[in-house]
């Protein structure tokens, strides 16, 4: 995590820290209402708040003000825990760490090349030799560009570009690129592990070594 943070700061990004508790209203701005497929995966604390299932809504909230206060392009990132009632399996966890980076206010025609640069920057800093970009359908963004690597082509992160319809509730109209990486998945592929449990937050493992030996 510290290596990725240092690389982003060295490349002009500013780290932000937003609350772990998120309001229902902010999720609704991302089109996640009671009928959305992701809603059933959310850990609701009460009728109005939940443990954040993603970082994006809070980053939108911060960006709408930074676009007014800072010169463009605005470059920020956040590293933080997210929570979802994910399907079981070696590559899923109910608590996981996301790294989201956003560059907003860049030239429209440079978005794709910049996205490639930023994906390579993080993947290489994580110690992963090669990766691919694949276009995938998304229940939130409509379409994303997934970064995959390793045996079995593990999804390391998902990227999107704007302007995007989800920008409208925030009155944002700037071109942007953003990527959300799963830190545990980056570590899993970098270390050649087959299980997220060995590299994530755990009571059973320390630095990938089982404690019940």
Identify the meaning behind each predicted range:
Residues 1-39:
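TRNA-binding/sensing appendages of the translation machinery
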Residues 44-213:
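A translation/RNA-centric and nucleic-acid-associated enzymatic feature enriched
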């Amino acid at each position: 995590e510290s290596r990725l943070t240092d690389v982003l700061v060295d490349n002009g990004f500013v780290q932000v820290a937003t609350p772990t508790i998120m309001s229902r209203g902010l999720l609704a701005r991302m089109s996640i209402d009671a009928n959305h497929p992701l809603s059933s995966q959310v850990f609701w604390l009460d009728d109005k708040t939940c443990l954040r299932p993603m970082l994006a809504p809070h980053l939108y909230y911060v960006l709408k003000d930074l676009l007014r206060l800072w010169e463009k392009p605005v470059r920020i990132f956040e590293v933080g825990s997210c929570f979802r009632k994910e399907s079981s399996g070696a590559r899923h966890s109910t608590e996981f760490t996301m790294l989201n980076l956003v560059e907003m206010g860049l030239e429209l025609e440079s978005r794709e090349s910049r996205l490639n640069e930023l994906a390579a920057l993080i993947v290489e800093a994580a110690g992963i030799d090669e990766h691919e970009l694949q276009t995938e359908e998304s229940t939130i963004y409509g379409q994303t560009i997934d970064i995959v690597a390793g045996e079995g082509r593990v999804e390391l992160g998902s990227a999107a570009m704007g302007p995007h319809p989800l920008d409208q509730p925030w009155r944002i109209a700037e071109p942007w690129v953003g990527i959300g990486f799963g830190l545990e998945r980056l570590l899993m592929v970098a270390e050649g592990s087959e299980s997220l449990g060995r590299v994530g937050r755990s009571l059973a493992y320390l630095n990938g070594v089982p404690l019940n030996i």
